Amino acid sequence: MKQIAAILTEYRHYSHADVIVGKFLKGFPTDEGMRPARVRIASMYVDQFPAADMSRDMASAYNVPIFGSIRQALTLGGDSLAVDGVLIIGEHGDYPWNELEQHLYPRKYFMEQVCGVFAQSGRAVPVFNDKHLSYNWADARWMYDRARQLGAPYMAGSSLPLGYRSPWVEHALDTPLREAVAIGYSGLDVYGFHALETLQCMVERRIGGETGVAAVTCLEGDAVWQAARAGRWSRQLAEAATAQIPGVAGVPLEEVLLGPAVFLIEYRDGFRGAVLMCVEREGGFETFGYAARVGGDGGSEVQACEVFLGGDPHPHFSYLSLNVEEMFVTGKPSYPVERTLLTTGILEAALISRHRGHVRVETPHLDVTYRSYESVPWRPTGPRPVGASATPWA
């Protein structure tokens, strides 16, 4: 059984470490039942131990040593790389925020330490980086390039691409997409990333594949609705997305998207995307949606869905983790890391736009090109969790 090192900022109840590492330790709840792990968590490095820390108890229960450095976790206390894969979960913990309201998690530092062990050992193993690569483009690009330089299979990103779509929408490769909108909620840094990945995992499947992003603008408040009236994002698509969401179908967008913000994304091939955020969660909605205008010169149709994330036991993280495990077992990423490289850069550009007074930010550096997956090994296909996916863990 392959041995995996878990490199964590902190491990407490419902943290990302809990809902990811916990499944590698206890098994993966899926709609078809519990699936035992095919790999073993062999070591942990934990950066912080809050009062609600779970890492020590879980490590003791599953006989996993916690090491005092990332190098030791990867070498199992020896002199060279001794594991077959690395989970980097740099989410949650007591870290500062900057003037862009980005949470300064040490993901680049974690990756730098991991890659140092790879370089010193003369070989690399697969790495998964939870959520966006870093809070800034320079670090994210370094992480991506360093993994490629060392030959490390690399995955990253949100669990949203593995969420429950209702109704099921999955564009075929080379679909003629004209325009798309994703809807999300909560903070622009912490959850705006999830909404961006909801959008990007869909629109990367358009004709010609992904070409990169030319410019990004962030708007807030009444400027969001003014932009809709000016045709800068499609109200029709946003309404199509909310029409699929129980409780808000038919409700005016102004009553759904409280404290609104929008990311206007201009792709290099002329495609337009938008991410709408309900920033004020009190009284607003708390889910995700997607809609696109699909069709060539002969006409078009709107395709839309809700993207639902279940509560305890958080099955969307099961499907995310199963795809990561697939990479650990096969050595092949389940979907392209370039998606998350691009969404990392889009998010930074949006927050820069906001900080500078909601100006348009040109992004010539986001010339990220790639082709989407043929298929994803593990994912739900129903509208809601069932079976083990809907059974809370004790």
Which residue ranges define each predicted feature?
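N-terminal Rossmann-like NAD(P) cofactor-binding module of classical short-chain dehydrogenase/reductase
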Residues: V83-G90
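Short acidic-hydrophobic, aromatic-tinged amphipathic segments that line or gate anion-handling sites
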Residues: P65-L74
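N-terminal Rossmann-like dinucleotide-binding module
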Residues: M1-A61, A180
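C-terminal helical cap and adjacent loop that interface with cofactors, partners, or active-site loops
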Residues: D53, G283-A394
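Rossmann-like dinucleotide-binding domain that binds NAD(P)(H)
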Residues: A180-R272, C278-G284, L342-G345
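Short amphipathic alpha-helix with an adjacent loop that forms part of the alpha/beta core around
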Residues: A73-L81, W168-H171
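Beta-strand-loop-alpha-helix segment that lines the small-molecule cofactor/substrate pocket
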Residues: E91-P161
